[in-house]
């Protein structure tokens, strides 16, 4: 069943729409990210998906309508992890130009290397305080250029 929402409609009707898809299964991290992104720039539309398989499903739906300006993926999610999602996205060439950032509590060099090889722009560690989260969110937003 297609997931239709205001973000999809806006992405379709308004080229350059500031829409970010975030794969995050932790409700606390979702709430913190939503708060910080909104505080930095409330013009962004944020959509959270809580498992890897649904991230792929949602992106395939968007492929027909509009594209996110940024994809942020938690590394450790149910059904597919961040690296597995990146691998799936390699089969969908339309997403090649969409920046993808992995964020994780794991500082594994192996995870980071694999994700960068699979097309992530960066692999960032989830910060432990609001100042760090704000810095990471600003950094993530820097990848989301309206001119893409």
Locations of the language-model features?
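Acidic, metal-coordinating helix/loop segments flanking the phosphotransfer/catalytic sites
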Residues: 48-70, 134
């Amino acid at each position: 069943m297609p997931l239709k929402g205001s973000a999809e409609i806006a992405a379709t009707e308004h080229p350059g729409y500031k829409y970010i898809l975030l794969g995050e299964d932790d409700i606390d991290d979702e709430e913190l990210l939503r708060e910080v992104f909104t505080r930095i720039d409330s013009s962004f539309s944020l959509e959270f998906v809580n498992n890897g398989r649904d991230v792929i499903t949602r992106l395939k739906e968007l492929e027909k309508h509009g594209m996110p300006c940024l994809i942020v993926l938690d590394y450790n999610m149910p059904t597919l992890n961040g690296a597995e999602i990146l691998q799936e996205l390699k089969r969908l060439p339309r997403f090649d130009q969409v920046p993808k950032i992995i964020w994780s509590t794991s500082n594994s060099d192996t995870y980071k290397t694999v994700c960068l090889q699979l097309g992530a722009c960066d692999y960032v560690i989830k910060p432990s305080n609001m100042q760090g989260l704000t810095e990471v969110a600003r950094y993530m937003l820097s990848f989301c250029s309206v001119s893409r």
